[in-house]
UniProtKB/Swiss-Prot annotation:
This is Enoyl-[acyl-carrier-protein] reductase [NADH] 1, chloroplastic. It catalyses: a 2,3-saturated acyl-[ACP] + NAD(+) = a (2E)-enoyl-[ACP] + NADH + H(+). One of its GO terms (biological process) is fatty acid biosynthetic process. Its main location: plastid. It comes from the Eukaryota. Catalyzes the NAD-dependent reduction of a carbon-carbon double bond in an enoyl moiety that is covalently linked to an acyl carrier protein (ACP). Catalyzes the last reduction step in the de novo synthesis cycle of fatty acids. Involved in the elongation cycle of fatty acids which are used in lipid metabolism. Required for normal plant growth. InterPro entries: Enoyl-ACP_Rdtase_NADH, NAD(P)-bd_dom_sf, SDR_fam. NCBIfam families: PRK06300.1. Pathway: Lipid metabolism; fatty acid biosynthesis. SUPFAM superfamilies: NAD(P)-binding Rossmann-fold domains.
Amino acid sequence: MGASAATGMQMVAARPCISASQGMLTSRAAVSRIGRALSTTTGFATCPRICYSSPLGSSKRSGVAIRAMSSESGPQGLPIDLRGKRAFIAGVADDNGYGWAIAKALAAAGAEILVGTWVPALNIFETSLRRGKFDESRKLPDGSLMEIVKVYPLDAVYDSPEDVPEDVKGNKRYAGSSNWTVKEVAESVKNDFGSIDILVHSLANGPEVTKPLLETSRRGYLAALSASSYSFVSLLQHFLPIMNPGGASISLTYIASERAIPGYGGGMSSAKAALESDTKVLAFEAGRKGKIRVNTISAGPLGSRAAKAIGFIEKMIEYSYVNAPLQKELLADEVGNTAAFLVSPLASAITGSTVYVDNGLNTMGLAVDSPTISS
């Protein structure tokens, strides 16, 4: 994780200045009582010190200016603390995607990490972990290595063993693995750990992603929705019973859900639109049923191995760099840090939202690198 993660996972508390010029606060005792009440109800780790000041320097001033100051002792700001929390991250198969970055951010905040890896990629992933090939990218801000407590085989296209077709059961890429449908994985996690607090969906696949929508088959279109959007519904459906109240779930989406991105085809744009719509519905249902928050992160393009299947990911990254308000490289860690915030108590009132982490590209309605504009 980048250096920013070491200190960047903190939200600096604002310092409001409240005037009492109307005589609403007439004594320091009253102010102290209010200060104590605020520190109790907000749940801040450090009680703010209430400082009294008179900018005019006059003892005749009737009002009292109040400024909340952080204590000189103890941690500054609002640290993201996920100690004692357990996260299951579905869709981690290497060390260069958003799923991995989210796992690192949650681990850096203290969470216990479980991952679900696509069955055909399981052997390579576990072997790479065991041989230390990921050790450099496992490094956390404190110098330790992210620990993945357990890796589960997972294919989120199938809800239960009854859904798996015979040709998949006999496929050699699935040989030696068992209990990898969504229902079975949820049951395995329950048997192994009892419960989780955080569920992350980092899954997407469109077998015809390089085809224009007008050339996409029904089978390819539905496959994209099944793997990229319904898989989130299925995961939450099966994991919700073992999620602790107050927990959170997040997924990853893309701006193609609402804008035409030529080349991002095969029904993938539709799948992302469905994912964002489902996020709102699931936020209501999971919130009422299990007190679970549900959000999605609309991340900018990243040159991960999975994204290279699109065929023009490097051009998408360059386009983003040139046209986004923030002309800088988008780091996977920035998405990871956003995820850590969204699943933390600091985001306890945020649910059903699509949060953009793309250097602001989603705000643009005109490509500034267009020859028409540049000329």
